[in-house]
Amino acid sequence: MSEEEQTNGSLSIRKPSRMPKCSRCRNHGFVSPLKGHKRFCNWRDCQCQKCRLIAERQRVMAAQVALRRQQAQEEEMGICSPINLSGSDTLVKNEAVGENVFTLSSGPPSPASSSATASPTNLGSRSMLSLSPAMSSRGHTDCTSDLMVDASYYNLYQPTPYSSYYSNLYNYQQYQMPSGNGRLSSHNVSPQYRTHSYYSSYLSQGLGAACVQPSTCPEPKAAAFSDGAQDSVSISSMINAENKLECESSSESGSFSVDSIIEGATK
């Protein structure tokens, strides 16, 4: 017992307390404790090969620490949870998985080939076949991911199953042009509220001069806009000529009567 106690005491004496040392100073042959030394290091801006390797290693370690911290925060928020994947699963790619699926589903393998083909690729393909439904449900395309997305978080990016029902919710019907009788095909209007049919005939025949009438001739205008205004252009021109003659005669007779009345009053 005494010898064991002595050996334990000697080991405790030999093993000093671990204090980190400056790696840049060690590269140049100096030993200096790291605590409070980073600001005053003489080789903090050294660009030698060893110091560049040390700087690269420090950047990689800092990135790993930041990634672990981010994963821990996501786990606390419930966004994702880590899963354990084997090495063969992480090495198999999706293209190889698709080829192995077709080869396995094409036909039953022969006994010789089944006994001879026990390769890690086939093992990886089998494991990936077992994982393929879960990965297809999550929508992942890369099997090297070590995070499994939560269902509530992933549903934000899934299309809604009622898209076909709600897609036409606010799609109104297009405006329908009026038919020959001036009504829409989906409306049944009483005869007293029906519009006249001269709009379609007027627009199709181009009777632009029929609506330009003097204010002293209301009868030709009513005749031009009646329901029987679907005549030819020659008839409308004849009506316009007659209207002009009647208007001129009425204006002349009106002026003569006015002049005669004025002359009689002066006499």
Swiss-Prot record:
Its main location: nucleus. Pfam families: DM, Dmrt1. GO terms for molecular function: DNA-binding transcription factor activity, RNA polymerase II-specific; metal ion binding; RNA polymerase II cis-regulatory region sequence-specific DNA binding. GO terms for biological process: germ cell development; male germ cell proliferation; male gonad development; male sex determination; regulation of transcription by RNA polymerase II; sex differentiation. Keywords: Activator, Developmental protein, Differentiation, DNA-binding, Metal-binding, Nucleus, Repressor, Sexual differentiation, Transcription, Transcription regulation, Zinc. Expressed in developing germ cells of both testis and ovary. Residues 112-121, 248-260 have a biased composition (Low complexity). Residues 122-135 have a biased composition (Polar residues). One of its GO terms (cellular component) is nucleus. Residues 102-137, 246-267 are annotated as: Disordered. The keyword Ribosomal protein does not apply. Disulfide bonds: none annotated. Residues 22-69 bind DNA. Belongs to the DMRT family. This is Doublesex- and mab-3-related transcription factor 1. It comes from Danio rerio.
